[in-house]
Each structure stands twice: as C-alpha cells, then as structure tokens.
C-alpha cells in the first residue's frame, strides 16, 4: 500500500469513491470541478497495482485550524487500517504546516474518537458553518457531529492514549 499526495489523474477515482458514500448520505457529494480545484488538499492511498482505495483531504481555514474532509475507504477494504493510515498522513501534514487544531464533521464520531479526537459543539467552528454548512441541503436536519484534536495532544500512534507527562529531576 502506498500513501501519497493526490495527482490530477486521481480526480475521477476520488470522485467515484467520495460520491459512492454521498449516494448513501454518509458524506457530502463533491463535483469534479470542485475536486480538480482542490486536488492539492487530498492524500490518496493506492494499492500496488495502482487502484485508488482510500482518500482524505486537509482543508486549511487559517494559520491554526484545518478540517479533515472526504475521508473514505473503498467499501470492500474497510476495517483494514487504511482510514487510519490516511488520517495519520493528514495529521502529519497538519503538523508540518504548524497547525494547532484539526476537526471534522462526521456521522462516524466513534472512528475519530478511537484515534484521539473528542466531540465538541459544531458552533466551535463558525467559519465552517458559514462557508459550507449553510449551503448544505441537510443543514436544518444535520446529523453530523463535530470532532476535534489538538495536535499538541496527538497520540504518538493513532488509537493509543497520549503519553503521560513525566517529571525529570536533576
């Protein structure tokens, strides 16, 4: 399995994968135009034979905050750790940018909580709500939960608790 940044020729496969879940009302649809304009946000997982099997995007909001978006894995390969690997890479990117906080709106908060995220009120991210949520057809009946992670508290390995601080005496 190879984890890498998305390329323009990945867009049709990202579109297929994301919109498969959008059709099941698990995530929001993305147009081809939107994906081409924002392909740089995506990290992609590809199997050795080059088949795209998972993706996720890091949407920057300001110098401190980014959103994890469009995180999904081919339905036939769920529960194999691919989503966790994509998330790990997205968090590495967030840290490389010097961000402090990442968040997601999701109908699967348990997945994120297992990785060290915690549920918070959606109103904590007003830019997201005003930019995207108000235009969503599901705004008035949204069932997504907001989850967040402070990168300073990020576990060394996703799914494990952050190490306890220890005192060092001289």
What would you call each of these model-derived segments?
Residues 79-94, 104:
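Conserved acetyl-CoA-binding loop-helix of GNAT-fold acetyltransferases
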Residues 1-2, 96-102:
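Short active-site oxyanion
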Residues 2-14:
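A short beta-loop-alpha structural element at the N-terminal edge
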Residues 71-78, 107-108:
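A short, internal acetyl-CoA/4′-phosphopantetheine-binding micro-motif in the GNAT/acyltransferase core
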Residues 29-41, 47-48, 54-65, 70-71:
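A conserved beta-strand-loop-helix scaffold within acyl/acetyltransferase catalytic domains
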Residues 16-29:
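Helix-loop element at the rim of GNAT/NAT acetyltransferase active sites that forms part
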Residues 125-170:
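C-terminal "cap" of GNAT-fold acetyltransferases
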Residues 100, 106-133:
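Conserved active-site alpha-helix within GNAT-family acetyltransferase domains
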């Amino acid at each position: 399995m190879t984890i890498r940044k998305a390329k323009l020729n990945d867009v049709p496969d990202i579109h297929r994968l994301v919109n498969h879940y959008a059709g099941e009302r698990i995530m929001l649809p993305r147009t081809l135009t939107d994906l081409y304009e924002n392909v740089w946000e995506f990290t992609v997982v590809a199997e050795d034979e080059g088949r795209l099997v998972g993706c996720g995007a890091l949407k920057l909001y300001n110098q401190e905050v980014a959103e994890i978006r469009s995180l999904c894995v081919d339905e036939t390969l769920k529960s194999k750790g691919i989503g966790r690997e994509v998330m790990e890479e997205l968090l590495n990117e967030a840290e490389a940018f010097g961000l402090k906080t990442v968040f997601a709106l999701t109908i699967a908060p348990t997945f994120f909580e297992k990785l060290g995220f915690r549920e918070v009120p959606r109103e904590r991210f007003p830019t997201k709500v005003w930019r995207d949520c108000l235009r969503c057809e599901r705004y008035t009946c949204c069932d997504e939960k907001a989850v967040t992670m402070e990168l300073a508290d990020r576990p060394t390995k996703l799914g494990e608790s952050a190490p306890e601080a220890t005192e060092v005496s001289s």
